[in-house]
A protein has these predicted regions:
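Accessory DNA-engaging acidic/polar modules
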Residues: 1-176
C-alpha cells in the first residue's frame, strides 16, 4: 500500500512525520483523508463522529478533524476578515458562509444568520443535518474561492494534501 509522508514542526520544535495512508473503504478506496475532506466532508465527519477510523487512519482523522474545524481565514487587506454562517430558515439546514470585514454590520436577515467567527469550520453543516451535500457543496465552494479564487478550483490529491500540510492555514489552540 502506497503511503504519503510529510513533515512539520511540532510545538516543541521537533519534526513530526504524518503519513497520509490511502483508504481501503469501498467508497473512497485509494483516496487519502485530505482528499476525502474536500470531496465528501459529510462522510468524513460521520466516520469521525462514529469512531469508524481505526489504527493509523484514526490518528490521521484526528489531525484532519482539528484542522478542518479551525481553518484560518486568509487576511488580504487592512481589515480583519471573518466568516458569517447562515442557515436556511425554511429547511433549517446549513446555507453557507460569507467572508467579509469584521467591521461590517451583522447581516439584517436575522432569521438565517447564525454567528460570526474568525475561522472556517467544515463540521458546521452536520450540526443541522446528518446528510447535507448541498450545504457542504456551498461551504467547500466558498473555501476554494477564498483560498484559490474560484469555486471550481480542481482539488487534486497533491493540492488537498498540501492544504492540510500547511500549518499557516490553521488556528491551533494555545497551550498555557
Amino acid at each position: 500500500m502506497l503511503k504519503m509522508q510529510h513533515s512539520r514542526q511540532s510545538d516543541q520544535g521537533r519534526v513530526l512525520t504524518m503519513v497520509w495512508t490511502p483508504l481501503g473503504f469501498k467508497k473512497h478506496r485509494g483516496k487519502t483523508l485530505p482528499q476525502v475532506i474536500f470531496a465528501d466532508p459529510d462522510w468524513f465527519f460521520y466516520m469521525y463522529e462514529n469512531r469508524r477510523f481505526k489504527s493509523g487512519h484514526a490518528v490521521e482523522a484526528e489531525e484532519i478533524y482539528k484542522r478542518a474545524t479551525s481553518i484560518k481565514i486568509r487576511q488580504d487587506g487592512k481589515e480583519e476578515l471573518v466568516a458569517d454562517y447562515f442557515r436556511n430558515p425554511v429547511t433549517d439546514r446549513f446555507y453557507g458562509i460569507s467572508i467579509g470585514p469584521q467591521s461590517s454590520p451583522r447581516p439584517e436577515c436575522r432569521r438565517s444568520f447564525l454567528y460570526r467567527t474568525d475561522v472556517i469550520d467544515l463540521s458546521v453543516p452536520r450540526r443541522f443535518a446528518d446528510y447535507d451535500k448541498s450545504g457542504y457543496s456551498a461551504l467547500i465552494g466558498t473555501l476554494k474561492n477564498h483560498f484559490y479564487g474560484s469555486t471550481s478550483y480542481k482539488m487534486t490529491k497533491g493540492r488537498c494534501e498540501a492544504f492540510f500540510d500547511d500549518d499557516s492555514k490553521f488556528v491551533f489552540e494555545q497551550k498555557v
